[in-house]
From Swiss-Prot:
This is Bystin. The keyword Ion transport does not apply. Its main location: cytoplasm. Residues 32-41, 70-86 have a biased composition (Basic and acidic residues). The modification Phosphothreonine is found at T155. Keywords: Cytoplasm, Methylation, Nucleus, Phosphoprotein, Ribosome biogenesis. The keyword Cytoplasm applies. One of its GO terms (biological process) is stem cell proliferation. It is found in: Cytoplasm; Nucleus, Nucleolus. Disruption phenotype: Mice show embryonic lethality around stage 6.5 dpc shortly after implantation. Mice lacking maternal Bysl transcript upon injection of siRNA into fertilized eggs are arrested at the 16-cell stage, fail to induce trophectoderm, and show altered morphology of developing nucleoli. Embryonic stem cells lacking Bysl show accumulation of pre-20S rRNA precursors and a reduction of 40S ribosomal subunits in the cytoplasm.
């Protein structure tokens, strides 16, 4: 008997059921092949609009809304007019490389949601302020800005135009092309009115130029808005080398911060965020902002509190902090030095013994001081005793206890003495300690 041939796919087909079962099954609902369709619908729903297309859609919607408001007037007359962002021309590319330019509005909203008021006036104790003024430099050096240095270089070029300058004395600055001057004068107009939005491309390429200081001088940094200063700090901190970033901090950012505090008795939120953003390069921040502020001898209590709050809130590498503490401990004393040292000590770093020795010598230098030391000085000494009492040698502890006798404070000196006497010196072996 020949073999019965089965066609392809016949094995998967269902055999015919009896007629009664077919009639009963006909009344039931069958799912059919809807599963595949559902899978396709889910895949279609998961597709989303790309970020570039979303920005274009929002831009077109915003332009149409502005056209309607211009033709028919705003719907709500009682609402205050919305502050427009500075437009920099239609020719700028709308790619995703400039998304970070919108960072400031996000920061402002976050600050409002958190209830943080960086513009609140700093409360200063009058007694502490008078005590700090006693240790201020009576003949402070003249502060130099970027404009002063550029003008000095231009004057040198005019007086020595026919002289071939050696590598030691430097080189004369070249004349700028008139077209370049025209471009950056336009950038200056934008930065003087900048509130939010994207920055000109010509401004973003300044860190890559060899004569970036001269170009920056054309834009007149002293006339920038606070928001423009924040964006400039973000760009220069990210793209300049540490040495060049230090010059920008010292010649542009620091004078602006000090002038703003002196005028308004508080610091603008944009400038405060600029100081925090500058910590992207901690070495340049210490060399360009903190150390010059202490060396000036004119740092006020309000300036020290505001700048010191950034030290408290931000994470700083231990090597940079140790070097800064060593430098502050060895320089001439001013009241603000105690604030910065206390804040750095409160971060509880594992400091090298060289830094601890310099801090001890810093305090021992006041054994013959005739002026009344401020409370901030005693607080700094108390912080040193609390954080690093186990890292001090026996001779250092004895010298500090003698210092407390010469420079006493009715409330803080007993606490400092108790901290020093409760710890085992670092030069005493564990085996030599006897338990009573």
């Amino acid at each position: 008997m020949p073999k019965f041939k089965v066609t392809r796919g016949a094995s998967n087909r269902e055999k015919h059921a009896p007629l009664a079962e077919q009639i009963l099954a006909g009344n039931a609902v069958r799912a059919g092949t809807r599963e595949k369709r559902r899978g396709r619908e889910v895949e279609e729903e998961e597709e989303y609009v790309g970020p570039r297309l979303s920005r274009r859609i929002l831009q077109q919607a915003r332009q149409q809304q502005e056209e309607l408001e211009t033709d028919h007037g705003a719907g709500d007359r009682s609402a205050p007019p919305r502050e427009r962002a500075t437009r920099l021309g239609p020719g700028l590319p709308q790619d995703g490389s400039d998304e970070e330019d919108e960072e400031w509005p996000t920061l402002e909203k976050a600050a409002k949601m958190a209830g943080v008021d960086h513009q609140a006036e700093v409360i200063v104790d009058p007694e502490d302020e008078r005590a700090i003024e006693m240790f201020m430099n009576k003949n402070p050096p003249v502060r130099r800005t970027l404009a002063d240095i550029i003008m000095e270089k231009l004057t040198e070029k005019q007086t020595e135009v026919e002289t071939v300058m050696s590598e030691v004395s430097g080189f004369p600055m070249p004349q700028l092309d008139p077209r370049v001057l025209e471009v950056y004068r336009g950038v200056r107009e934008v930065l003087c009115k900048y509130r939010s939005g994207k920055l000109p491309k010509a401004f973003k390429v300044i860190p890559a130029l060899s004569n970036w200081e001269q170009i920056l001088y054309v834009t007149e940094p002293e006339a920038w808005t606070a928001a423009a200063m924040y964006q400039a700090t973000r760009i220069f901190a990210s793209n300049l080398k540490e040495r060049m970033a230090q010059r920008f901090y010292n010649l542009v950012l620091l004078p602006r911060v000090r002038d703003d505090i002196a005028e308004y008795k508080r610091l603008n939120f944009h400038l405060y965020m600029a100081l925090k953003k500058a910590l992207f390069k901690p070495g340049a921040w210490f060399k360009g902002i903190l150390i010059p502020l202490c060396e000036s001898g004119t740092c006020t209590l309000r300036e020290a509190i505001i700048v010191g709050s950034i030290i408290t809130k931000c994470s700083i590498p231990v090597l940079h902090s140790s070097a800064a503490m060593l430098k502050i401990a060895e320089m001439e004393y001013s009241g603000a030095n105690s604030i910065f040292l206390r804040l750095l000590l409160d971060k509880k770093y594992a400091l090298p013994y060289r830094v601890l020795d310099a801090l001890v010598f810093h305090f021992l230098a006041f054994r013959t001081e005739k002026r009344q030391l401020p409370v901030l000085w005693h607080q700094c000494l108390l912080t040193l005793a609390q954080r690093y009492k186990a890292d001090l040698a026996t001779e250092q502890k004895e010298a500090l206890l003698e210092l407390l006798r010469l420079q006493p404070h009715p409330q803080l000196s007993p606490e400092i003495r108790r901290e020093l006497q409760s710890a085992v010196p670092r030069d005493v072996e564990d085996g030599g300690v006897t338990m009573e």
